[in-house]
Amino acid sequence: WMYQGEPVDTIPEEYVGFVYEITNTTTGRKYIGKKLVQFKRSRPPLKGRKNKRRYKVESDWREYYGSSDALTEDIEQLGQQNFSREILFWCRNKAELSYIEAREQFARKVLESDEYYNGHIRVRVHGAGLNKK
């Protein structure tokens, strides 16, 4: 992953995820998406307790190449070396993550152009999670 021209090995602690762009360097076709850095998992409660035990697990963000079927197919055919992965925005919460992903997809008109792998835009955001200016 790259961010502003620099390689990314670790995610800053204050961010929950990022909005990214994957580019096919042979055709120029792109994909806009989002990725969470950690997932919440739960274990069954301990004996005699009712509440589940929750813990966090790091996601597969280091190896991730998007969820589009067409993109995955091209990556298998052309190889990962023909794709660049760039982080566009760091996000502090899930609402901001979903909002910025959808905002970028609408602004770039990803559904109206064959230049993008994106096949649909799915978003559900509550305004309370956004930092309003």
Language-model segments: residues:
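Structure-specific nucleic-acid interaction/processing domains
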Residues: W1-K133
